[in-house]
Structures are given as C-alpha cells and as structure tokens.
C-alpha cells in the first residue's frame, strides 16, 4: 500500500477542565481527558453493562488551545479530530514508559463544541488548517468536517431529525 492514514475522531465528554500550559518556546498547549462510553445488555443475564474509555488529548494548535481554555469545562460534550501519537519517556527509576495520545497539531485537527451549556456555543467548530481556522456555525449538514465547498443537499453529514439522545 502506497499510503497510510492516522486519523482519530472522538465524540465524548470532558472528565475535567482543560489543563493549559506553555512550552519553553511560549506556545500554548491544552491537555484534555475525554470519556467515551458504551452500554449493552448481557445476553445471558439480561443485565445492563457499561464501559467507559478515557482518552488523553493534546492540543498544540494555539487557537484551539485558546478555545479550550475559554469555553470548555468539565462535562462538556466535544467532537475531536486528530492523530494518534505514542510518546516514550523514562520514569524516576529509569524504566521506559509509554503514553498514547490523540494529538491536534498546529495546522491539523478539529475541535467542535457539541452542547449548549456554553451559552450559545452549540455546534461551534474550530479547525486547524487553511480557512478552517475560523468559527463556523453548525448547519445540520455535517458542520465543517473538512469539506471544501457548501453542503450539497442531503448527501452525507447529519440529519436534523436525528434524536439528540446518544445511545450510550
């Protein structure tokens, strides 16, 4: 295969307020912990089961980090688009440690606020490249998910008559 794809899309809730810090270069970085959950009914017992996965997200895009700092709070529902990266470091005992994170680089990645708890911020989309570095209102046609032109009717995207209830 000539190419490969490293793309992660998450829709989940923040487990804590964003952690904001500055690198030695002065660049702003935001760290998020996002929970995604699923539930199902056990076929043998009929018991309802739940599982939550926690994801570490690192935002190196200054504009997206500012949005996270200003508008995101614990419990906020967000859409994140980034890439997987694994870091390696040594702990205090000299043991190799690894951490896999979803990373939004300076010119790649997307952050979209999905709930209205942030006073009118429903569906605000913030992207990390080209003209997508600006706010755009959620139009019900999928928002700004990297499309280069206007939405073409009902092909793709989200439908306005979908139930707001997430199945997990």
UniProtKB/Swiss-Prot annotation:
Disordered as annotated region, ranges: 113-168
Q: Does the keyword Phosphoprotein apply?
A: no
Q: Which GO terms describe its molecular function?
A: single-stranded DNA binding
The record's listing under InterPro entries reads: NA-bd_OB-fold, Primosome_PriB/ssb, ssDNA-bd
S-adenosyl-L-methionine as a keyword? no
Which UniProt key words apply to this protein? DNA damage, DNA recombination, DNA repair, DNA replication, DNA-binding
In Gene Ontology terms, what is a biological process of this protein?
Answer: DNA replication
Q: Please report the name of this protein according to its UniProt entry.
A: Single-stranded DNA-binding protein
Q: What is the lineage of its organism?
A: Bacteria, Pseudomonadati, Pseudomonadota, Alphaproteobacteria, Hyphomicrobiales
Q: Where is the SSB domain?
A: 5-111
Query: Residues annotated as DNA-binding region?
Result: 54-60
Q: How does it assemble?
A: Homotetramer.
């Amino acid at each position: 295969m000539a190419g490969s794809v490293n793309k992660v899309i998450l829709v989940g809730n923040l487990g804590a307020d964003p952690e904001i810090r500055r690198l030695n270069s002065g660049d702003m970085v935001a760290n998020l912990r996002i929970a995604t959950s699923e539930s199902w009914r056990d076929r043998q017992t009929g018991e309802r089961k739940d599982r939550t996965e926690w994801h570490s997200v690192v935002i190196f895009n200054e504009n997206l980090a500012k949005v996270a700092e200003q508008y995101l709070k614990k419990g906020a529902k967000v859409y994140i688009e980034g890439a997987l990266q694994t870091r390696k470091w040594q702990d205090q005992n000299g043991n190799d440690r690894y951490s896999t994170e979803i990373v939004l680089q300076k010119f790649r990645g997307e952050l979209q606020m999905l709930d209205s708890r942030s006073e009118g911020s429903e569906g605000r989309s913030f992207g990390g490249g080209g003209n997508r570095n600006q706010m755009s209102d959620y139009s019900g046609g999928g928002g700004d998910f990297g499309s280069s032109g206007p939405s073409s009717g009902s092909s793709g995207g989200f439908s306005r008559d979908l139930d707001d209830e997430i199945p997990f």
